[in-house]
């Protein structure tokens, strides 16, 4: 056996020695997620992000994050089958300011509506709002039995389906084209568009369960902080607070260089 030093022992301990465990949450911060002013519940929850280190800025990691929230949580409501997507567009202090990014129906709601002995009619259309957002809206509706109908099935003819689909596209285009994004979202919350379609198609074939089932955001205009602040109900107040009222400007006081106020004996 050769006599010599054991190299492994001189290198300082075992090869598989335990490393110091660092808690990953110690390098992260919590930020509040704020919904736009269209919704009743503004505080959605909190999100986690790694603190600013060198060139990696925390706010850059938050911008573009998409949160999917049930409408019941946003409106403090019982009806919970609509989900809204909100995207973080700016970070102010510890608050993530979000904007509308899309809408969807839950899978269980969609499955519960699809049944036998009826016709399902779907339509989709790409529309641009007045403030430059390009949206793709998907609509769904189902035929129902006429009053005093004895027959089990309620199938619509192909020509009637085409007429209903055309009417769906017309109403969706009209409702979005003439409004900005804020007004469109205000119409999506109670789904007034679906009710309008149901009423308009009554003369062609009676419908039920008519919903705008999905809204996709295809294109957005260039980001403007002022417009986002308006959506959050802070645009007008900040600019008004910054400007002093007329007559409140005050008079300039002339003081010598190195002036210090006298020390008061009592406060």
UniProtKB/Swiss-Prot annotation:
Report the protein's function.
Component of the small ribosomal subunit. The ribosome is a large ribonucleoprotein complex responsible for the synthesis of proteins in the cell. Part of the small subunit (SSU) processome, first precursor of the small eukaryotic ribosomal subunit. During the assembly of the SSU processome in the nucleolus, many ribosome biogenesis factors, an RNA chaperone and ribosomal proteins associate with the nascent pre-rRNA and work in concert to generate RNA folding, modifications, rearrangements and cleavage as well as targeted degradation of pre-ribosomal RNA by the RNA exosome.
Compositional bias per record (Basic and acidic residues), positions renumbered to this chain: 245-258
Q: HAMAP family from the entry?
A: Ribosomal_eS1_euk
What are the start and end residues of every segment in region (Disordered)?
234-267
**Membrane spanning residue stretches:** none
Family assignment from sequence similarity: Belongs to the eukaryotic ribosomal protein eS1 family.
Organism of this sequence = Danio rerio
What SMART domains does the entry give?
Ribosomal_S3Ae
Q: Where located?
A: Cytoplasm; Nucleus; Nucleus, Nucleolus
Q: What are the record keywords, sorted?
A: Cytoplasm, Nucleus, Ribonucleoprotein, Ribosomal protein
Q: Any idea what this protein is called? A: Small ribosomal subunit protein eS1
Q: Which GO terms describe its cellular component?
A: cytosol; cytosolic small ribosomal subunit; nucleolus; small-subunit processome
């Amino acid at each position: 056996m050769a006599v010599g030093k054991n190299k492994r022992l001189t290198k300082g301990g075992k090869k598989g020695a335990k490393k110091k465990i660092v808690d990953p949450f110690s390098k992260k911060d919590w930020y509040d997620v704020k919904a736009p002013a269209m919704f009743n519940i503004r505080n959605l929850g909190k999100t986690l992000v790694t603190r600013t280190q060198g060139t990696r800025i925390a706010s850059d990691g938050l911008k573009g994050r998409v949160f999917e929230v049930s409408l019941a949580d946003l409106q403090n409501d019982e009806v919970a089958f609509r989900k809204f997507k909100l995207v973080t567009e700016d970070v102010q202090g510890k608050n993530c300011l979000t904007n509308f990014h899309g809408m969807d129906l839950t899978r269980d709601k969609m499955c519960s509506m699809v049944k036998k002995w009826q016709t399902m009619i779907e339509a989709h259309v790409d529309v641009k709002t007045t403030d430059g957002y390009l949206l793709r809206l998907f609509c769904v509706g189902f035929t129902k039995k006429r009053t005093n109908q004895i027959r089990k099935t309620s199938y619509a003819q192909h020509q009637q389906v085409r007429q209903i689909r055309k009417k769906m596209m017309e109403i969706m285009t009209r409702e979005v084209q003439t409004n900005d994004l804020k007004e469109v979202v205000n119409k999506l919350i109670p789904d007034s568009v679906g009710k309008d379609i149901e009423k308009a198609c009554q003369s062609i074939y009676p419908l039920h369960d008519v919903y705008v089932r999905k809204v996709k955001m295809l294109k957005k205009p260039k980001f403007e902080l002022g417009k986002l602040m308006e959506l959050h109900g802070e645009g007008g107040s900040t600019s008004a607070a910054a400007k002093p009222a007329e007559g409140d400007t005050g008079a300039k006081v002339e003081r010598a260089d190195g002036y210090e106020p006298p020390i008061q004996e009592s406060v």
